[in-house]
Amino acid sequence: MLTVTNLSHQYGTNAAISFGNFSLDAGHALLLRGGSGAGKSTLLHLLCGVLPVQAASGTVVLAGQSLQTLTRSERDGLRPYAVGWMPQRQFLMTSLTVLENVLLPASLAGRADDAACKRATALLHSFAIADLAHLRPQTLSVGQAARASLARALMTQPKLLLADEPTAALDAVSSGLVIEQIARYVQGGGAAIIASHDPAIHPLWDSVSNSDATLDEIELPK
């Protein structure tokens, strides 16, 4: 599914951030640990195509495709069907309803048909926010917005889910729902990478997943 080899990234003249080597198969998840500045968000940006994999900075192969060979438009095309992206800041569009936000990936691809609408509604039910479907995102709590953001990332059933600090500032109930839905996605054959410093992630995962959905942990070098 995903193979990362000797990957690094450099911002301007700053020292390069090194991510080393790792791989991820379908039906598995990785938990990225590391302090502030370790590059957790940068790594996710590289994997989802927001940042380019620079020449001589290693390789990333996703579902048999080398990301460093892709143009900007081709990288943008990874989202949302190859990669589902849940950024640290939720970035829900305030001009759309919650349902329209969840449906947005399908709408942008011209695939907002009846089946897509039914899937979006089903996702809202699974995240316990179906009653908020026709509200604007600015009326949501932090936890509700996080659930809507994850539902949007899962809307197109991507091969790989990237979640940046998905439980940040959430209460226990919302954190549990978010991790449970990520675990279900992995149990269904997806692959996920979670970047987080939340010590509750692993215990939450163990409480909601079965032995078939493993959560391995890697520490990014300082």
Residue spans of the language-model regions?
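Conserved catalytic motifs of ABC-family nucleotide-binding domains
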Residues: 157
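Catalytic Walker B motif of ABC-type/P-loop ATPase nucleotide-binding domains
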Residues: 161-164
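Conserved ABC ATPase signature
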Residues: 136-140, 144
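Short coil-to-helix segment of the ABC ATPase nucleotide-binding domain corresponding to the Q-loop/switch region
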Residues: 96-104
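ABC ATPase NBD coupling module
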Residues: 67-84
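Conserved ABC ATPase "signature" region
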Residues: 66, 103, 115-132
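Conserved ABC transporter NBD signature motif
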Residues: 56-66
